């Protein structure tokens, strides 16, 4: 079983209340984009204004924090907004409480948006499919705690490790756009899945987009045919919704 030690540093979480969306479908245009976020050592930065990926940078790149041209970033299954610990923009995220991105929503008050105010252990180096590979290398990195799944490692009173001491397990504190539980490796349970949640993302300049991740393993053409590939993400978005 592959266990990943996770820790969380809280820097004052903004409350995430849910305004009630209007029940009628909107007439907005829904865009669909595929982002290659398979690399463990990079974040991929996307601009809603430009409708495309505009930068790819190493996970600890400091210069990207001063860049206000990006709005949302992807690292495997972790997400950032241009705000707080991740950037100097006016970004943030809000969980709408619906699963249909075509449903009209109400943009909440500014204080309902949560900036990137937490860090969590993220894998920055790992070799898939190599039984001799070293354990994953992790580092505490900033992320958005609404768009990303937040976890902690707790003692599992029902199991013991090889040394006879109590084993640990992953506790999911919040489900973001994509959920991953590495405890499920080698079991019949899914290791990763989609929450199917719709979010409002506030951009670096204070505008708003609606977003929903609809695939976290988009197929890639290989010698074996179309192969589902973890970290190949497809998301839908509507911009602007102001």
Spans of features found by a protein language model:
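Bacterial N-terminal signal peptides that target proteins for export
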Residues: 1-3
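C-terminal motif of bacterial Sec signal peptides marking the signal peptidase cleavage site
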Residues: 11-15
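Surface-exposed, beta-sheet-biased, low-hydrophobicity segments with strongly acidic/polar composition
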Residues: 19-242
């Amino acid at each position: 079983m592959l266990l990943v030690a996770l820790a969380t540093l809280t820097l004052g979480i903004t409350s995430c209340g849910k305004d009630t969306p209007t029940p009628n479908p909107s007439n907005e245009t829904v865009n669909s984009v595929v982002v290659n976020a398979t690399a463990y050592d990079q974040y991929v930065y996307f601009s809603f204004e430009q409708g495309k990926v505009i930068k790819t940078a190493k996970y600890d790149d400091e210069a990207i924090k001063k860049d206000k041209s990006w709005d949302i970033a992807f690292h495997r299954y972790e997400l950032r907004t241009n705000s707080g610990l991740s950037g100097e923009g006016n970004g943030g995220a809000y969980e709408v409480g619906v699963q249909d991105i075509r449903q009209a929503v109400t943009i909440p008050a500014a204080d309902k948006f949560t900036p990137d105010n937490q860090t969590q252990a993220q894998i920055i180096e790992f070799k898939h499919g190599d039984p001799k590979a070293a354990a994953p290398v992790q580092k505490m990195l900033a992320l958005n705690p609404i768009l990303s799944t937040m976890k902690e490692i707790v003692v599992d009173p029902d199991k013991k490790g090889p040394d006879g001491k109590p084993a640990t397990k992953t506790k999911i504190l919040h489900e973001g756009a994509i959920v991953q539980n590495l405890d499920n490796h080698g079991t019949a349970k899914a290791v990763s899945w989609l929450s199917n949640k719709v979010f409002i993302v506030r951009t670096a300049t204070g505008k708003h987009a609606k977003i929903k991740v609809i695939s976290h393993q988009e197929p890639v053409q290989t010698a074996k045919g179309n192969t589902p590939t973890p970290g190949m993400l497809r998301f839908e978005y509507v911009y602007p919704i102001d």
